[in-house]
Structures are given as C-alpha cells and as structure tokens.
Curated annotation (Swiss-Prot):
It comes from Thermofilum pendens (strain DSM 2475 / Hrk 5). This is GTP-dependent dephospho-CoA kinase. PANTHER family: GTP-DEPENDENT DEPHOSPHO-COA KINASE, UPF0218 PROTEIN TK1697. Belongs to the GTP-dependent DPCK family. InterPro entries: GTP-dep_dephospho-CoA_kin. GTP binds at D48, V49, V50, D66, E124. Its EC number is 2.7.1.237. GO terms for biological process: coenzyme A biosynthetic process.
Amino acid sequence: MSSSPAARRELSYSWGYLFFDEPPLSVEKAWRLVQSSRFGKTLILVGDVVSKSFRERGLGDFFIVDGHTRRNLKVEDLPGKAEAFTCKNRPGEISRECYELLRNLLTSAIGRGKKIVVYVEGEEDLLSLVALLYCPLNDSWVIYGNFRGYLEVIPCTSFFRSVAENLLVKHFEKD
C-alpha cells in the first residue's frame, strides 16, 4: 500500500501521549505512564532509536527496526534471545509482506514471554499503523519516535485502532 499526500498530512498530527525530552528522560516518563495505566505493560517499539533507548533500560517486548536512524546511531543490543523476523518495505509504503508478518506476530506470538524483533529491509516508519491495528487491545502500547524528534506513546485502545484503520482504508492506495 502506498501512502497518499492526504495520509502524509494526517500522519503529521500527533496522537497519544507526547514526550519532548531526550532519552533517557523521555523513556523514564513514558515508562512511568505505562506503569500507572490500566492498559497493560506490553511495549511495541517502532524505530531504531526508540528500540535502543528502551532496550538499554531492559524494556520492550516487540521491536520493529530498519537499521537506519536520522541520528546515524548504530542500533545493536536488541534482545539476543529474541525471535527474529525479516520483511521488506519501501519508504512511504506498507508492503503486503510486512503487513502480513506483523499481523500474524501481533495476533499470535506476542505475549508468549519471548521477545520479538522484526528487521525491516527498507523503512519501518509507517509500520506503526499496522502495529496499532493489531496490538493486543487494552493490554499494550505502541511507541515510536515522531519525525519532529519527540516520543509518541499510544495505548492500544479501540479508539486508536479505529484511527489507524481509517487512515489505512482512506489514505493508502492498494498495490
């Protein structure tokens, strides 16, 4: 699926909780929010810097990374005993391969106590929408770094799931 100009416009708006601090402060604030909420503690992390920042504090259950960062950081130290998967995804798109992989993993594999890492060949940015669509409802959070540099922390609720679904249906052209 390719994103339309309208999708890019709508995705420029922020949703969920926003943290404008740099790591580690942003991570600490986000984790306090998660701990004090009723939405579970499962963390789905999208992006290399976010994944690295949370992982350095022993946090995270599901990681979606592409090996590229705007800050040119090398992301290593993801969970060594994690189940690792790979898919290809071009910039500005959501490939069928990544969509299906994330849907299957998020609906069946997450929550079994094992860490999961999805390595994306290409770009992972838009895959946060798929994560929101299939995250464990009322029991998880999708967290990613916004292109403006702040941390977006979104509880997996029916409201945010419907926002992601509407964006995908209305503003992504099926290939």
